[in-house]
């Protein structure tokens, strides 16, 4: 790894699958002006091979009137952690008018992103997955030690994102679940505080 390169930290379930179609997310506004709801669909990987945080934020800003409710719907295996964190923070800044909706899967970086919403509703047959960040590396021993340090630091960012959503969660238990790569059912996610409500889905 180049000593000047920023490591790309992944938080993604499974191996990356190359596809050509990049239309993996969409935004739409529905209803009259007084009852307008903005829906953001994040369906696919997060990062340069799918939807980047820059695209997400710029498109959301173009539609957001500062008043209407925003629903961010997720079906994503995750991707680039830093893009996920940026999405998390963008949703958090919307405050109480933002709802995160897990339609099928919010894994890895997507689980970090959706937890930025004020309220999270998870479909009864959906899942949320949490695990350690990971990356690729090359270089000498010093390079690998530096990469390990960065992974430790990004782990703290992940824990902080989950704790912001679920402040009452036992941190030791949270760290154990993250380290073990844990797949949570809808009811388990609600029990932990990472989701607020089980929605439709079956």
What would you call each of these model-derived segments?
Residues 1-109, 116-202:
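N-terminal organellar transit peptides
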């Amino acid at each position: 790894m180049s000593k000047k390169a920023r490591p790309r930290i992944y938080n993604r379930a499974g191996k990356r699958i190359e596809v050509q179609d990049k239309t993996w997310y969409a935004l739409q506004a529905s209803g009259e002006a007084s009852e307008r709801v903005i829906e953001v669909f994040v369906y696919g990987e997060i990062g340069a091979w799918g939807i980047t945080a820059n695209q997400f934020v710029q498109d959301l800003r173009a539609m957001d009137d500062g008043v209407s409710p925003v629903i961010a719907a997720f079906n994503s295996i995750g991707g680039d952690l830093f893009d996920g964190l940026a999405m998390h923070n963008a949703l958090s800044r919307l405050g109480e008018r933002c709802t995160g909706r897990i339609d099928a899967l919010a894994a890895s970086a997507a689980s970090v992103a959706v937890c930025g919403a004020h309220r999270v509703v998870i479909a009864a047959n959906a899942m949320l997955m949490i695990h350690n960040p990971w990356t690729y590396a090359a270089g000498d021993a010093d390079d690998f030690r530096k990469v390990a340090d960065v992974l430790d630091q990004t782990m703290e960012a992940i824990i902080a994102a989950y704790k912001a959503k679920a402040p009452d969660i036992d941190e030791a238990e949270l760290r154990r679940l993250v380290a073990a790569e844990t797949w949570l059912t809808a009811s388990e996610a609600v029990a932990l505080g990472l989701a607020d409500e089980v929605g439709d889905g079956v």
